């Protein structure tokens, strides 16, 4: 049946470890982790309705609200909200998913608030199995960042990724991943780039989800940073890259 989730969360103070000259502190560092234990005054309420069906489509709706406590100066207190819709369809040969999100006074998270900022995100992603051995994954994404008070960083971001994969057996597979991204700024031109990666992989099962995995890869790409070069006042805006290496991936 339909399920409803709701939660309240608080953000803790960030902490950047620094060496201290005070010899009374045995460790001589200000903190030992990436965050402290204090409340920094930023809160969020999150909610999600899921397990809904619209014919063959699975539907999820979520809403998040961010606000500040008195720990934040009155002049800096700000509210933010975010709403999203996820539509997905699963069959024997794969899955397709559409994600739509609108944010007010925030972008990716209602913790990090910016006055008069609106952000829109939309993506289409999925995977398809032609056979058990031949599969492909893909993603199309769009992101619109619009700050009504400061338009110097306003931009539209377009991205596309496709990854055909062939599994020779339960251990060995070959993947070819191609990606393209363009960031179109309202001021100062755009940045764009592409990347192509060929990898030979060793894993414990047949499928892209199996880990741990040992990967040997070669990656080539090019980035044309016209916007960044204009902002920084540099003449060189194009970067070429070729990388060869190996990596080990694992998750639990």
Regions found by a protein language model. Give the residues of each.
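Outer membrane beta-barrel
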Residues: 1-63, 218-223
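Extracellular loop and loop/strand-boundary signature of outer-membrane beta-barrel proteins
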Residues: 18-36, 71-73, 109-112, 147-150, ...
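Detector for outer-membrane/organellar transmembrane beta-barrel domains
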Residues: 45-185, 192-196
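Short Gly/Pro-enriched loop/turn and capping motifs at secondary-structure junctions
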Residues: 181-185, 205, 220-225
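A contiguous, mid-protein "functional segment" used to position or interact
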Residues: 192-194, 198-199, 213, 217-221
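Outer-membrane beta-barrel "beta-signal"
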Residues: 198, 210, 236-252
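Outer-membrane beta-barrel biogenesis signature
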Residues: 204-215
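Internal helix-turn-beta structural module
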Residues: 215-233
């Amino acid at each position: 049946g339909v399920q409803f989730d709701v939660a309240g969360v608080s953000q803790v103070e960030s902490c950047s470890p620094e060496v201290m000259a005070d010899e009374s502190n045995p460790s001589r560092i200000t903190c030992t982790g990436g965050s402290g234990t204090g409340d920094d005054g930023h809160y969020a309420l999150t909610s999600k309705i899921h397990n809904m069906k619209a014919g063959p489509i699975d539907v999820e709706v979520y809403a998040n609200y961010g606000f500040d406590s008195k720990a934040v100066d009155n002049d800096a207190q700000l509210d933010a909200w975010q709403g999203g819709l996820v539509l997905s369809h699963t069959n024997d040969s794969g899955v397709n998913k559409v994600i739509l999100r609108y944010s007010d006074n925030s972008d990716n998270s209602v913790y990090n608030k910016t006055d008069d900022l609106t952000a829109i995100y939309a993506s289409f992603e999925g995977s398809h199995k032609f056979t058990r051995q031949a599969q492909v994954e893909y993603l199309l994404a769009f992101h619109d960042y619009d700050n009504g008070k400061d338009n110097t960083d306003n931009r539209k971001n377009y991205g596309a990724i496709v990854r055909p994969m062939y599994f020779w057996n339960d251990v060995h597979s070959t993947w070819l991943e191609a990606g393209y991204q363009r960031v179109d700024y309202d001021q100062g031109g755009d940045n764009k780039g592409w990347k192509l990666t060929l990898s030979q992989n060793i894993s414990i099962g047949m499928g892209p989800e199996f880990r741990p995995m040992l990967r040997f890869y070669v990656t080539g790409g090019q980035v044309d940073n016209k916007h960044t070069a204009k902002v920084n006042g540099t003449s060189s805006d194009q970067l070429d890259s070729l990388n060869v290496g190996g990596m080990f991936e694992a998750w639990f």
